[in-house]
From Swiss-Prot:
Gene3D superfamilies: 3.30.230.10
Native organism: Sulfolobus acidocaldarius (strain ATCC 33909 / DSM 639 / JCM 8929 / NBRC 15157 / NCIMB 11770)
Keywords: Ribonucleoprotein, Ribosomal protein
Molecular functions per Gene Ontology: RNA binding; structural constituent of ribosome
GO biological process, one term: maturation of SSU-rRNA from tricistronic rRNA transcript (SSU-rRNA, 5.8S rRNA, LSU-rRNA)
Protein name: Small ribosomal subunit protein uS9
Cellular-component GO terms for this entry: cytosolic small ribosomal subunit
Family per record: Belongs to the universal ribosomal protein uS9 family.
UniProt cross-references to SUPFAM superfamilies, sorted A to Z: Ribosomal protein S5 domain 2-like
Alphabetized HAMAP family for the sequence: Ribosomal_uS9_A
Amino acid sequence: MSQAEQNFMITYARRKSARASCYIKPGNGKVFVNDIPIEIIPIEVVRYKIMEPLVLAGDKITSSIEARIYTQGGGIMGQADAARMALARALVKFTNSKELVEIYKSYDRTMLAGDPRQTESEKWMRYSARRWRQKAYR
């Protein structure tokens, strides 16, 4: 394996029905989400959610990497959560730092471990997963 292949990390993450993959390598601090620079993502909540692992990691680590995140499926926030998880896992794997793992776990455990909750499916003869027809006694 060459030196360039050793410094290249790929991680995956899922949240609900959204999937994300993160490709990380040494670089100059640029992060792209679906080939769009993270700075120009129009929805601020999504942008800040994806940037959380970078902010927690610090400027020293952030300025020395280049990350490309590709998301598909699900909704906007599901994709943002999956991208955040994939980026956090990639940074931990790339830096091989126990301190970074502890920082992420103390801030939000789902950055590394994930969130297994799924939408409950709709049942037959019901309007939704739990809603039933109102019962009339008179």
